[in-house]
Amino acid sequence: MTQEKHNAAILGGGSFGTAMASILAANGHNVNLWVRDPETAAAINIDRENTRYLPGAELPKEVTATDSLEEALGGASMVFVAIPSKAFAEVLEQARQWVPDEAVVISCTKGIYADGFLLMSELLHQYWPHTRIGVLSGPNLAKEVVEQKFTGTVIASPDETLRQTVQNALSCDYFRVYDNPDIYGVELGGALKNIYAVASGMAAAIGVGENSRSFLITRALAEMSRFAVKLGANPMTFLGLSGVGDLIATCTSSLSRNYQVGFQLGEGKTLEQAIECLGQTAEGINTIKLVADKAAELDVYMPLATALYKIVYHGQPLELMIQNLMSGEYKHDVEFQLGAFTS
């Protein structure tokens, strides 16, 4: 089958946006990579490298960096949005006039927008209602993607044709794209796991064992699915790449930004110091407070998320997380209750 060639726009020149640009260009698509800074755009075009976020990774000649949204979006049939959640709505508003009607638009951002507890796909529906919207999520550490280490991901959308289009555009011998119609569950999985990556990094810093880490990750999955079902997601989604797959990768890898921030916090650094050391966005830090507040509002039992909020934002000792894990109310080991899910 001959692959259709696309004009693709990537909004966001961070590590994941750059990784997506690399895959699309290597697959023969024309790619415009939008970055805010004109000097960064010029450097990428000259050096064929994003030295700040993915140093050493050569970008194909089909990638053109630009600081102009109009130029990036002109004639685009596919748009990948990889903007930090705090700036997501701002960029959507700025770009609104140049987004082509019926363009396939994919959110790559694993975060939650504070005003209204909105996921990124919900913001896309608000700002770009004339487009076709999906979400890309999974255990996709950007450095490994550009190093072409074999990776799986998920494209989620109720639009089957959109899912097939994205699968065809991104799939190659090292990047396999699965599909899922549960856009809300896939997106929630990507956002929620960042909380527990922070927790896992903190636990690693104080030297917990492998038993402890496995315990932490498994109970994190229970919290994620419990919370998501309350919001209407399919719990089975959390057994796939965008759920447990992403959770494992993010909670066990030092390449994970959220894990790195957690590790720094566990070593005794302040939140400000940890973020400064990272030099990039760690979505989990913002998500912790949003989810802890929402869990309280919805009366969802989330002892890990609640303890982590108190540790990060109120200076409580790290031992509180362990105490909550070990002394909370007794629960079933497996809590995937399909009866609670309504499509």
Swiss-Prot record:
<dbReference type="InterPro" id="IPR036291">
    <property type="entry name" value="NAD(P)-bd_dom_sf"/>
</dbReference>
<dbReference type="Pfam" id="PF07479">
    <property type="entry name" value="NAD_Gly3P_dh_C"/>
</dbReference>
<feature type="binding site">
    <location>
        <position position="283"/>
    </location>
    <ligand>
        <name>NADPH</name>
    </ligand>
</feature>
<feature type="binding site">
    <location>
        <position position="257"/>
    </location>
    <ligand>
        <name>sn-glycerol 3-phosphate</name>
    </ligand>
</feature>
<feature type="binding site">
    <location>
        <position position="256"/>
    </location>
    <ligand>
        <name>sn-glycerol 3-phosphate</name>
    </ligand>
</feature>
<keyword id="KW-1208">Phospholipid metabolism</keyword>
<feature type="binding site">
    <location>
        <position position="246"/>
    </location>
    <ligand>
        <name>sn-glycerol 3-phosphate</name>
    </ligand>
</feature>
<dbReference type="GO" id="GO:0047952">
    <property type="term" value="F:glycerol-3-phosphate dehydrogenase [NAD(P)+] activity"/>
</dbReference>
<protein>
    <recommendedName>
        <fullName>Glycerol-3-phosphate dehydrogenase [NAD(P)+]</fullName>
        <ecNumber>1.1.1.94</ecNumber>
    </recommendedName>
</protein>
<comment type="function">
    <text>Catalyzes the reduction of the glycolytic intermediate dihydroxyacetone phosphate (DHAP) to sn-glycerol 3-phosphate (G3P), the key precursor for phospholipid synthesis.</text>
</comment>
<dbReference type="Pfam" id="PF01210">
    <property type="entry name" value="NAD_Gly3P_dh_N"/>
</dbReference>
<keyword id="KW-0560">Oxidoreductase</keyword>
<dbReference type="GO" id="GO:0046167">
    <property type="term" value="P:glycerol-3-phosphate biosynthetic process"/>
</dbReference>
<keyword id="KW-0521">NADP</keyword>
<feature type="binding site">
    <location>
        <position position="36"/>
    </location>
    <ligand>
        <name>NADPH</name>
    </ligand>
</feature>
<dbReference type="InterPro" id="IPR011128">
    <property type="entry name" value="G3P_DH_NAD-dep_N"/>
</dbReference>
<feature type="binding site">
    <location>
        <position position="15"/>
    </location>
    <ligand>
        <name>NADPH</name>
    </ligand>
</feature>
<dbReference type="GO" id="GO:0005975">
    <property type="term" value="P:carbohydrate metabolic process"/>
</dbReference>
<feature type="binding site">
    <location>
        <position position="16"/>
    </location>
    <ligand>
        <name>NADPH</name>
    </ligand>
</feature>
<feature type="binding site">
    <location>
        <position position="258"/>
    </location>
    <ligand>
        <name>sn-glycerol 3-phosphate</name>
    </ligand>
</feature>
<dbReference type="InterPro" id="IPR006109">
    <property type="entry name" value="G3P_DH_NAD-dep_C"/>
</dbReference>
<keyword id="KW-0443">Lipid metabolism</keyword>
<dbReference type="InterPro" id="IPR013328">
    <property type="entry name" value="6PGD_dom2"/>
</dbReference>
<dbReference type="GO" id="GO:0051287">
    <property type="term" value="F:NAD binding"/>
</dbReference>
<dbReference type="InterPro" id="IPR008927">
    <property type="entry name" value="6-PGluconate_DH-like_C_sf"/>
</dbReference>
<feature type="binding site">
    <location>
        <position position="142"/>
    </location>
    <ligand>
        <name>NADPH</name>
    </ligand>
</feature>
<comment type="similarity">
    <text>Belongs to the NAD-dependent glycerol-3-phosphate dehydrogenase family.</text>
</comment>
<keyword id="KW-0444">Lipid biosynthesis</keyword>
<feature type="active site" description="Proton acceptor">
    <location>
        <position position="193"/>
    </location>
</feature>
<feature type="binding site">
    <location>
        <position position="138"/>
    </location>
    <ligand>
        <name>sn-glycerol 3-phosphate</name>
    </ligand>
</feature>
<keyword id="KW-0594">Phospholipid biosynthesis</keyword>
<dbReference type="GO" id="GO:0046168">
    <property type="term" value="P:glycerol-3-phosphate catabolic process"/>
</dbReference>
<feature type="binding site">
    <location>
        <position position="110"/>
    </location>
    <ligand>
        <name>sn-glycerol 3-phosphate</name>
    </ligand>
</feature>
<feature type="binding site">
    <location>
        <position position="193"/>
    </location>
    <ligand>
        <name>sn-glycerol 3-phosphate</name>
    </ligand>
</feature>
<dbReference type="GO" id="GO:0005829">
    <property type="term" value="C:cytosol"/>
</dbReference>
<dbReference type="InterPro" id="IPR006168">
    <property type="entry name" value="G3P_DH_NAD-dep"/>
</dbReference>
<feature type="binding site">
    <location>
        <position position="110"/>
    </location>
    <ligand>
        <name>NADPH</name>
    </ligand>
</feature>
<feature type="binding site">
    <location>
        <position position="257"/>
    </location>
    <ligand>
        <name>NADPH</name>
    </ligand>
</feature>
<dbReference type="GO" id="GO:0046474">
    <property type="term" value="P:glycerophospholipid biosynthetic process"/>
</dbReference>
<keyword id="KW-0547">Nucleotide-binding</keyword>
<keyword id="KW-0520">NAD</keyword>
<keyword id="KW-0963">Cytoplasm</keyword>
